[in-house]
């Protein structure tokens, strides 16, 4: 059995739950910027990310989508999000964002997604001491549809998006491979 280590309040070896919200460690943001990518380095480790998809090919790799409270956005930003959302479905910009209405309106920044491993999760995002997990099927289907389009573009044009998804993914894959070798020794 794999030994568990505490990273924040998230145990290494503990599995992330698909569709759960988590708070990331600053380390993943530092990796993104060190590889030439751009991310919300100033507050990205304070906001929840949506870990929507377990990678189908790489064990231990997940995909994180940053979220934001839309009420903190100015009118021009909200106009931009609405313009993207109003684009024809064939236009990739229609996949950049998704808005989820709940207790508060959350913006899912799908085009800012990045790969992540449990090592870079600080803790579960909780409300009233309960881990927040997105359960509304319509939102999950739409987020996943848009996410697949973003990743398809990234696969055609590596590092197309500002966070350098391909470079971050390759870095994390090498890290997972190195850790797997250590575990077998």
Residue ranges of each PLM-predicted region?
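Sequence-level motif detector for i,i+2 pairs with an aromatic at +2
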Residues: 17-19, 59, 105
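Compact nucleic-acid interaction/catalytic patches
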Residues: 42-46, 55-99
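C-terminal terminal-subdomain/extension
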Residues: 12-15, 78, 82-185
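Short N-terminal edge-element motif at the start of the domain
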Residues: 13-46
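Residue-level detector of flexible, active-site-proximal loop/helix-junction positions
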Residues: 28, 71, 120
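Residues at the C-termini of beta-strands that transition into short coil/loop
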Residues: 25, 68, 117
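Positively charged N-terminal leader segments that act as targeting/secretion signals
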Residues: 1-14
